[in-house]
Amino acid sequence: MLRIVLTDKAQSDLDSIHEHYQGVIGTQDATDVITSILEALQHLQRFPGCGRPSVVPDVRELVLTRYPFVAPYRVVQGQLQILRILHHTERPRDWSME
């Protein structure tokens, strides 16, 4: 099974998402949002091809259905690298993944 690795930017994205939701819906509900996102990412371990193809070469995108986020990812050397976790309105050309 592939090992999930969050890039520093993906971890920073999660922190920002938590901070945003904490201010809007409270700490516990913000934590529930993050838990839901992480559970969706775990699904990729079993089904790494389930994300849609991206315009970025060698990258797929997991579209989160419960919350308005997209998680671009790629498989590299036995790792499932989560590159970012971004609002669905952000365009791939604006994504800084490195």
Residue ranges of predicted features:
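Basic/aromatic recognition patch in beta-strand/loop cores that engages polyanionic ligands
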Residues: L38-E39, R46-Q79
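Amphipathic, soluble alpha-helical interaction motifs
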Residues: S16, H20, H43, F47-C50
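Enriched for short, Lys/Arg-rich terminal
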Residues: F69-V70, R74-E98
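Solvent-exposed interaction patches of small proteins and small membrane subunits
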Residues: D32, V55, V59, E90-S96
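Arg/Lys-rich, positively charged N-terminal/basic patches that mediate binding to nucleic acids
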Residues: M1-I34
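Generic leucine side-chain signal with a strong bias for well-ordered alpha-helical environments
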Residues: L6, L14, L41-L44, L80-L86
